[in-house]
Amino acid sequence: MAITQERKTQLISEFKTHESDTGSPEVQIAVLTESINNLNEHLRTHKKDHHSRRGLLKMVGRRRNLLTYLRNKDVTRYRELINKLGLRR
């Protein structure tokens, strides 16, 4: 259900903007998207897990805020990230 450290490192290396980058909006959004996708798979099989559903909604809200921040700050980076992750915004 949670992302492994190897997968997280892989996402960071894929979306980083500079060499020691771990906290840029792109990296945070990519890690959140991976967690959201994993939690969606979990909730498909465990429909009554409302505690995890609440966590999913919090993650989606956090990702939405980061996407709004990135769109306001740099539209080209925002569009590239949306296309790369395959999000529908």
From Swiss-Prot:
PANTHER family: RIBOSOMAL PROTEIN S15, BACTERIAL AND ORGANELLAR, SMALL RIBOSOMAL SUBUNIT PROTEIN US15M. The gene is rpsO. InterPro entries: Ribosomal_uS15 (IPR000589), Ribosomal_uS15_bac-type (IPR005290), uS15_NS1_RNA-bd_sf (IPR009068). Part of the 30S ribosomal subunit. Forms a bridge to the 50S subunit in the 70S ribosome, contacting the 23S rRNA. One of its GO terms (cellular component) is cytosolic small ribosomal subunit. Belongs to the universal ribosomal protein uS15 family. It comes from Bacillus pumilus (strain SAFR-032). Keywords: Ribonucleoprotein, Ribosomal protein, RNA-binding, rRNA-binding. This is Small ribosomal subunit protein uS15. PROSITE patterns: RIBOSOMAL_S15. One of its GO terms (biological process) is translation. One of the primary rRNA binding proteins, it binds directly to 16S rRNA where it helps nucleate assembly of the platform of the 30S subunit by binding and bridging several RNA helices of the 16S rRNA. It comes from the Bacteria. GO terms for molecular function: rRNA binding; structural constituent of ribosome.
